[in-house]
Amino acid sequence: MQTNFGTLFEAQGILRYTEKPTYKCILEIDQEIVNYYRWFLPKCLEINPQKYRAHISIVRKEIPKNLDFWAKYEGKVINFWYQNVIYNGEIYFWLDAYSLDLEKIREELGLSNLWIYDKPLIGFNKIFHITLGNVKKNLFD
């Protein structure tokens, strides 16, 4: 699907939940998506790979208000869309990702999909992301 900000590609991932040490819900995605887009990152920067295997965070640093739905979709295959545009901030490089199914899961858990940083594409309420890497300095050097 073509947008004003690049092309959207459809992919799938597997939903995983953990409760310890904190509540986390992620969509495990194909590592090759990250590997492919990392190739395009500037070679003049020392960009570290992401800390964990390729994923999209759905719940992170939040406590769900409605735990009756926690782990309801464990292991379920979920569709998502991602853009072929690499974004970066001071530390991170990422791809934007979108999924109405992931938004629904957040709603069931009593979490907001309100996104205040950027405007999501029409039809979506939240922008998720796929981390490609970071430029954090190694504290042990």
Regions found by a protein language model. Name each.
Residues 1-141:
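Histidine-dependent nucleotide/RNA phosphoesterase domain, centered on the 2H-phosphoesterase fold
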